Regions:
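Short, solvent-exposed loop/turn segments at secondary-structure junctions
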Residues: 104-107, 115, 124-125
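Aromatic side chains
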Residues: 48-51, 110, 131, 141
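Compact, glycine/acidic-enriched structural inserts
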Residues: 126-148
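Glycine-rich, often proline-containing surface loops adjacent to acidic residues and nearby aromatics
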Residues: 31, 117-118
Length: 150
């Protein structure tokens, strides 16, 4: 994951008097996911925790990466990973995905059955782009968010 991109977003946000959410540690992640018994929990603990230990979700210029709601005061709103996956999973065909985030036109997901990271067109759920890893997906997501902010 590109820490440089997160640092650039942090500089942009600070220019508006905003801050990025504080990171959360692995123990807190496990504590917050203890009541979940599904692929979303496994994905968070095995993959997405690396991002959450840098920043607990992101809401930047219409681009959102889901985080975990904590009892702590966050500097910005956190779009809860479990809440949003529960919402998207109300549609049966969406249950094959773990939803990582979204922007105005796309969802960013992990396809459980194919072990793929994807950008999906929001209205149609057609594949826009495939990524080799979560890090590649996050780098593309963050780069695009910065580009749209310019």
């Amino acid at each position: 994951m590109s820490l440089e991109l997160l640092e650039k977003i942090e500089r942009i946000e600070s220019g508006y008097g905003e801050k990025l959410n504080s990171p959360i540690d692995l123990d807190k992640i496990k504590s917050l996911s203890k009541n979940e018994i599904n692929e979303v929990k496994i994905f968070i603990e095995q993959e997405y925790s690396r991002f959450l230990t840098k920043v607990n979700g992101l809401d930047f210029n219409g681009s959102v990466l889901y985080g975990l709601k904590t009892d702590d005061n966050c500097s910005a709103e956190v779009y809860d990973f479990f809440d949003y996956n529960n919402i998207w999973h109300e549609v049966e065909e969406n249950k094959r995905f773990v939803f990582i985030g979204e922007n105005n036109i796309s969802w960013f997901v992990y396809n459980l059955s194919n072990d793929e990271y994807l950008e999906l067109d929001m209205p149609s759920a057609e594949v826009v782009e495939k990524f080799n890893s979560l890090d590649d997906l996050l780098e593309s997501f963050l780069s695009d968010a910065i580009e749209y902010a310019s």
